[in-house]
């Protein structure tokens, strides 16, 4: 996250999964200030994690918009970190609210969570595919689930999404 600090200076967050439960730390400010204490790092156990630095393009600058965002869905835990702009987020949000969704943030990222949660598909992967078919714009995102990590990007590949390897570790 330190290497990505230049992409967002408002806030930073990390969500990890330890095989049983998700753990999240999100805070306003820089990565160095938010993750400089050993107790914070120890509170994020697991073999899989997603981090995010925030630069607001949609939604107010507040803690409730700091990513990764997390929700307990019918299919299990679901965390998402998103880079980009969902151009039809206002329209989708309005439809979701009319159908009973209750939003906790003003971030367009939360629209993805609600689309996944309300999808009629059975599996989480099929729900995510169904959700992203409704989304317009330029984006890349990382989703954490109890089964692992899912990486997605917009159909035109406008937003960067890079995968690499560091030893035995895969990094996006």
Write out the residue ranges for each language-model feature.
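Conserved short alpha-helical segments that host acidic/polar catalytic motifs at enzyme active sites
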Residues: 1-172
């Amino acid at each position: 996250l330190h290497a990505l600090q230049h992409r967002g200076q408002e806030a930073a967050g990390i969500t990890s999964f330890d095989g049983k439960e998700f753990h999240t730390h999100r805070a306003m400010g820089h990565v160095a200030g938010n993750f400089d204490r050993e107790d914070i790092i120890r509170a994020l156990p697991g073999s899989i994690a997603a981090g995010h630095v925030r630069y607001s393009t949609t939604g107010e600058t507040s803690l409730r918009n700091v990513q990764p965002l997390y929700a307990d869905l019918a299919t299990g835990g679901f965390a998402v970190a998103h880079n980009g702009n969902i151009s039809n987020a206002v329209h989708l949000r309005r439809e979701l609210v009319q159908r009973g969704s209750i939003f906790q943030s003003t971030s367009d990222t939360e629209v993805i969570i609600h689309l996944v949660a309300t999808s009629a598909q059975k599996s989480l992967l099929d729900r995510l595919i169904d959700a992203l078919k409704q989304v317009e714009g330029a984006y890349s995102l990382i989703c954490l689930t109890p089964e692992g990590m899912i990486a997605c990007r917009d159909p035109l590949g406008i937003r960067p999404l890079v995968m690499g390897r560091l030893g035995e570790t895969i990094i996006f």
